[in-house]
Amino acid sequence: MPILTLVTPPQDLSAADHFCTLAVLHYDDTDAPPRFAAATAMLRSDPALPGVHLWAAAAAADPDAVAAHCAHDAAAASLRGGPMDWQPLLYLCYSRSCGSVNDVLACATTLLDAGADPDAGFLWQGMTPPFTALTGVFGEGEQGPRRQPRHAADPALAELLLRRGAHPVDQQTLYNRMFRPDNAHLELLFGHGLADAGPGPWEMRLGHRMETRAQMWRRQLDWAAAHRFTDRLQLLESFGIDTSGVQIAAPPTPPDPLARDESGATALHHAAWAGDLPLLRRLLAAGADPAAVESRFGGTPGDWAAHAYQTEAAEVLADWVREHPR
C-alpha cells in the first residue's frame, strides 16, 4: 500500500476529472456546498461521466458503472488515478455529490469485493495522521459541518468499511469530529474495537510520525473537558480510557456582548460561525454589534455566518439589522 499525498489537481482537466474535483472534499477552503452542487448539476447534465473511468463512477456512486469498470479490469478497484490520484474507494467516501445510500453501499461492496483496501488513505499535504476512507465518511473538521459535511451514507458506509476490515483507530476522524458534542462516531468505532485494537496498518508503516495512542486520547480528553462534553468523557471512561486527573471546565459565564478576543472577534462572531441561534439572539438583545469587524479577516458576524454556510444565523443577523436600523 503506497503512501499517498494529497495532490493539487491540474488545471487542464477532462470533464470526468473536473466532476471528481468538484464532488469530493479536499479539506481546504474550497470545500463548500456550491461546489458539491455544481458537481451534482454537472452529472445531471452529462450522465455518461461515470462511464469514462472508475474514479468518476465512484465519485458519482453509480453502481452499474462501478460494476462495469471492475468487470472490465479486476485490478481497477485498487488503482490510483483521477485528479486527486486516489483509489476509487476514496472518491466514493469523500464525495458529497453521490447517489442514494443503497447505491453508495452497492458501490462500496463491489469495490471491496474486487480488492479495494478498506484502509485506503492519503497524507494531507504530507502530514500525519492519514485521511482514510473512514475519515471521508465521518466528515466534518475545522471548517465546520456545513462546509465539510458527513457523507450522506454515514453511518451505514462506515459500518460496512469496519466490517470489511477498516482499522477502528482513525486518528483524523477523532480529530475532525471532536469539535461538536455528538458522539455517534465514537460509539461506532468503540463497537469495532477502538479502545484496545492493536497497531493499524498506517501506524505500522508511519511509526514515530504518528501520535501515540496516549497522545491521541489526551487530545480528546482535553477538548471534551475544556468544552464540558461530559457525555463524551463518560463514554470514554466506560470503554476503559483513563480519565483520571481530567478537570472539567467551569460553566461559562454569559459572554460580554462587546468584548473582543485577540483577533478582534466578538462573541457574536463565534456564535454566528457555530450557528448557535439561541446565543446569537441573546447577544443581540444584550447589545452586541452585528456590524463589528474583526481584524484577522476583516469580517462581520454576518460574514462569518456566510463563510460557514450557517444560513439560519445569517438570516437572524440580517433580520436584526433590518429591524434595528442605526
PLM feature segments, named:
Residues 28-35, 59, 63-66, 106-109, ...:
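Helix-turn-helix repeat elements of alpha-solenoid scaffolds
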Residues 63, 155-175, 245, 264-266, ...:
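Internal alpha-helical scaffold/solenoid segments in large eukaryotic proteins
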Residues 233, 244-249, 296-324:
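Leucine-rich solenoid repeat scaffolds
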Residues 99-106, 144-157, 181-189:
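Surface-exposed loop/turn motifs in large extracellular/passenger domains
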Residues 36-48, 68-77, 106-118, 155-166, ...:
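Ankyrin repeat domain, specifically the short helix-to-loop turn at the C-terminus of the second helix
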